[in-house]
Amino acid sequence: MKIKDTERSLFFAGLMIALKDTNFRITYKNIQAPTKEQQDTSKYKLIESHNLNKAIIEAIVNQINNRINSYSKEINWKGQFAFILDIDYELKPYKELISKIEKNIFTPFEFDEKQDILGKAYKIFLSRAGKIDNKNIILTPDHIKHLMVRLARLSVDDIVLDTCTGTGGFLMEAMEVMSKLAKGNDELIERIHRHQLYGFEIDRTLFALACSNMFLHGDGRSNMIFGNSLIEVGSKIYSEFKRTYKPRKCIINPPYEKNLPIQFVYKALELLEPNGKLIIVMPSITLNKNCLLYTSDAADEAR
């Protein structure tokens, strides 16, 4: 099976996570094609890469399955990466590909976890597939991410929220800044990772990439919520989130379609604690005559 354009970034994410697994990293080069006995006992003809694909899935599940919060347990991580089982690739070049990723990307990344590596991969794969023009896919440039997080003026005590997380770039940037502010205090850094970074994402692929990204960047308990942040005020998840986590800073780059940016502004203001701060990229369309009233009302509410 050829890897679909929409799954290439997930495949790359899966390999990066699998390489985190010591057993997989040691054994993948020695994995062989299915034996005659395996073929004889299988209901279906097994592809040459069957055992390697299976090992990748097992390593992914082993690494990530128990490291997300209860809001996201409905995501079946084995199912999310299940397409890997059908990748029909000759074993030798397949293992060579993984080896190149390990040597040229994974190992350097282990020494410098600051990059939004999955976000960059997602952008590359989308552009090659000719899908980068989708207005609902917002890929924030690094310099904008750096600026917005600086404008948030984060402290080590802040609870940071992104209501349209994408691949998790803002949360990773915030995690890095807050971890530096902790000045080597391991207990404080652990608290930041475990309890102070939250994100909503409704797209399954982006959600999986964001969780994978946060995992790869050292946050083993990514507080990602699979769902729509534009939820009703009276809903259970809304009430529980606001009551429990009390976010002080919200950093977002919302989808640009129709009046979605304004809706995200209102929702962020509802979720933020009093005297909280919202940092947002707003498209110029929000200043035209059709949206200006909503924009003005949102500004008044923020005051």
Q: PLM ranges: what are they?
A:
Residues 1-28:
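Non-catalytic accessory regions of SAM-dependent methyltransferases
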Residues 6, 111, 115, 138-142:
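Conserved phosphate/pyrophosphate-binding and hydrolysis machinery centered on Walker-type P-loop NTPases
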Residues 17, 24-128:
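Long recognition/docking surfaces used for binding and targeting
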Residues 21, 229-230, 298-299:
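Hydrophobic pocket-lining residues within nucleotide cofactor-binding pockets
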Residues 134-262, 270, 275, 284-285:
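Conserved S-adenosyl-L-methionine
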Residues 267:
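Short, conserved SAM-binding segment of the class I
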Residues 285-292:
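Conserved class I S-adenosyl-L-methionine
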Residues 294-303:
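Single conserved hydrophobic/aromatic residue that forms the stacking wall/gate
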